[in-house]
Regions:
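Accessory alpha-helical/coil subdomains and C-terminal extensions
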Residues: 35, 103, 111-116, 122-126, ...
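Short beta-strand elements at the ligand-binding edges of bilobed clamshell
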Residues: 147-158, 293-300
Length: 364
């Protein structure tokens, strides 16, 4: 009996369970394969004792419409930077990758499917270079992997953000206010741009293009002066002003620095007030609401396609590669290519042209 190990790493997102289910159901058609799941990414292998569950068709029945991941996930640590607490209470990290590879060999693992974002797939590439039979499945609601046209969970996150814009429009109009909606997007503003277009926002602030606060002030004052006494601004969490920085905190809780973004909405309002904008402004942060809940139909289908393709890549020995969506096909691309550069919004993209055609300001 051959053994396949499946793990989910990084932040959770809608569609993870649908991928797991698809892998297990496809593997069940090949009688010689057993599928295992490592709890909290690689932690389940590195912990003592190990925490691994057998993923059977019965266990994954009906999980495709559930949010989260039944094998849990983590965005802390990993085989190459495992956190260790020192005697003096400080933290450091060590490389346990060779130890983990020995444990996988001892467990009789023939192949690994890693479902995760850019950080997870960089780990996948490094493990492949060390000889591990590994395949990547892209997962990021930011949609910031350049080797795939879309990642599962992104469309659900856009839907959630768009619904928030719709609701803020009605309350903004009722109170003659400006609402600033902060959505996820560290380096790529795809969620903000899509939801701004879908929801009819007045201004959209993206990480790719530092904004000019005076352009926003002028734009919103013109709107109020023309009897449209309300507006919605959609801002990516990674947006920043010209000659300014992103809003973030540095966390060192597990021995290495982790950059936690958040707070652009609040700072943007402070900047607007400092620039002389006198109208009432409020901010709303969606945060992890974008990661949770039921995946929409599009993401369920894409997740199913990714899961089936990933297992078939295992059968074909296509290790060191990642599943990718190149419309209309699901294909395999090298992990090295997948993590080479991010997928960012460009000024000459159709989506930016559409936003400008709808008179949505990018404040640049």
């Amino acid at each position: 009996m051959k053994r396949l190990l499946v793990l989910t790493g990084g932040g959770d997102c809608p569609g993870l369970n649908a991928v797991i289910r698809a892998i297990v159901k496809r593997a069940a058609q090949e009688k010689e394969w057993e599928v295992l799941g490592s709890i909290q990414a690689y932690n389940g292998i590195l912990w003592e004792p190990t925490e691994v569950v057998r993923l059977t068709p019965e266990l994954v029945r009906g999980i495709h419409f559930r949010g989260g991941t039944i094998i849990e996930t983590t965005n802390k640590g990993g085989p190459f930077n495992w956190p260790v607490k020192n005697a003096d209470g400080t933290w450091s990290t060590i490389d346990r990758s060779d130890e983990m590879l020995r444990k996988l060999q001892y467990m009789g693992i023939d192949a690994v499917i890693s479902i995760g974002g850019d950080g997870s797939q960089r780990i996948s590439q490094k493990l492949y270079e060390k000889g591990l039979n590994i395949i990547g499945v892209p997962k990021t609601i930011d949609n910031d992997l350049s080797s795939t046209e879309c990642t599962f969970g992104f469309q659900t996150a856009v839907q959630i953000a768009t619904e928030a814009v719709d609701k803020l429009v009605t309350t903004a109009a009722s109170h003659n206010r400006v609402f600033v909606l902060e959505v996820m997007g560290r380096d790529a503003g795809w969620i903000a741009l899509h939801s701004a277009i879908a929801g009819g926002a007045e201004v959209c602030l993206l990480p790719e293009f530092p904004y000019d606060i005076n352009i926003v002030k002028t734009r919103l004052e013109q709107r109020f002066n023309h009897d449209r006494g309300f507006a919605v601004v959609v801002a990516s969490e990674g947006a920043r002003p010209k000659d300014g920085q992103q809003v973030y905190e540095i966390s060192t809780e597990v021995g290495y620095e982790n950059k936690k973004l958040g707070g652009i909405g609040r700072r943007f309002i402070e900047e607007m007030k400092a620039a002389g904008f006198s109208h009432d402004m409020r901010e709303t942060t969606l945060g992890h609401l974008q990661r949770g809940g039921v995946p929409i139909a599009y993401d369920r289908v894409l997740s199913a396609e990714f899961g089936v393709k990933a297992f078939e890549m295992v059968l074909n020995g296509q290790f060191g590669q990642m599943v990718a969506y190149h419309h209309p096909d699901v294909v395999a691309v090298s992990l090295k290519e997948a993590v080479a550069q991010p997928n960012l919004v460009s000024l000459d993209s159709d989506l930016v042209r559409t936003a400008r055609g709808l008179n949505i300001s990018l404040a640049i």
